Amino acid sequence: MFRNQYDNDVTVWSPQGRIHQIEYAMEAVKQGSATVGLKSKTHAVLVALKRAQSELAAHRKKILHVDNHIGISIAGLTADARLLCNFMRQECLDSRFVFDRPLPVSRLVSLIGSKTQIPTQRYGRRPYGVGLLIAGYDDMGPHIFQTCPSANYFDCRAMSIGARSQSARTYLERHMSEFMECNLNELVKHGLRALRETLPAEQDLTTKNVSIGIVGKDLEFTIYDDDDVSPFLEGLEERPQRKAQPAQPADEPAEKADEPMEH
């Protein structure tokens, strides 16, 4: 199909009923480094993989503080995420100033959905090329929300977005029944294990490339970076594929090729 006929602007529909500019923005989210969000009955946790633009540059921030009860992790264009984060901070400040109370998480997510929908319907605008995982805690308990460049948003028990995030989602689906009863340390470890699934076999999580955000009952949103991550990583078991295999003694003869394999 000649997509160039229908992807010049966000207001043009293809004959198949698709808007290609929005689909391209969704692809931008998949280019960002992976991030994971999950919740229990008392806490919501964000775990993100940080990248460095080069060996000479510092790692980029992946988890941002919005309010005392809300934080976000991002995948996609950092500049777009910064703009949306500033919008969210302003809405939270307005709620505290006008109503003297924290802004409910679901209300904030609804406002983000309305803001990101505007450039998907107006000529000369482009969709925001960033996906967000929003972690928060309010009177309804802990929350994990996912937002998309298409202006859709979803209430999740656990979610992962970004590059190679399907591997993390597979882990989350396998262990989802355990999350609600987990304590905080176990919940963070589940998030780290899920994030580790997105890495190639030769890489592993370190204090330099991991960032953790936690919010919960009687706990304001807190970001852990660098050395603060060490206590969480120390209790994490080694990846099965990275465990060293015992070396075969040199004097032990190799198995014969014609011997049947054991099952």
From Swiss-Prot:
Residues bearing the modification N-acetylmethionine: M1
Family: Belongs to the peptidase T1A family.
SMART domains per the UniProt record, alphabetical: Proteasome_A_N
The protein's name: Proteasome subunit alpha type-1
InterPro entries according to UniProt: Ntn_hydrolases_N (IPR029055), Proteasome_alpha (IPR050115), Proteasome_alpha-type (IPR023332), Proteasome_alpha1 (IPR035144), Proteasome_asu_N (IPR000426), Proteasome_sua/b (IPR001353)
Signal peptide stretch: none
Primary localization: cytoplasm
Composition-biased stretches (Basic and acidic residues): 253-263
Modified residues (Phosphoserine): S110, S177
Organism: Macaca fascicularis (Crab-eating macaque)
PANTHER family in the cross-refs: PROTEASOME SUBUNIT ALPHA/BETA
Keywords: Acetylation, Cytoplasm, Glycoprotein, Immunity, Isopeptide bond, Nucleus, Phosphoprotein, Proteasome, Ubl conjugation
Assembly and binders: The 26S proteasome consists of a 20S proteasome core and two 19S regulatory subunits. The 20S proteasome core is a barrel-shaped complex made of 28 subunits that are arranged in four stacked rings. The two outer rings are each formed by seven alpha subunits, and the two inner rings are formed by seven beta subunits. The proteolytic activity is exerted by three beta-subunits PSMB5, PSMB6 and PSMB7. Interacts with NOTCH3. Interacts with ZFAND1.
Location of region: Disordered: 232-263
Cross-link (Glycyl lysine isopeptide (Lys-Gly) (interchain with G-Cter in ubiquitin)): K115, K208
UniProt-annotated glycosylation sites, renumbered to this chain: S110
Role played: Component of the 20S core proteasome complex involved in the proteolytic degradation of most intracellular proteins. This complex plays numerous essential roles within the cell by associating with different regulatory particles. Associated with two 19S regulatory particles, forms the 26S proteasome and thus participates in the ATP-dependent degradation of ubiquitinated proteins.
Any one Gene Ontology cellular component term annotated for this protein: nucleus
Localization in the cell: Cytoplasm; Nucleus
GO biological process: immune system process; ubiquitin-dependent protein catabolic process
A matching Pfam family: Proteasome
Entry-linked CDD domains: proteasome_alpha_type_1 (cd03749)
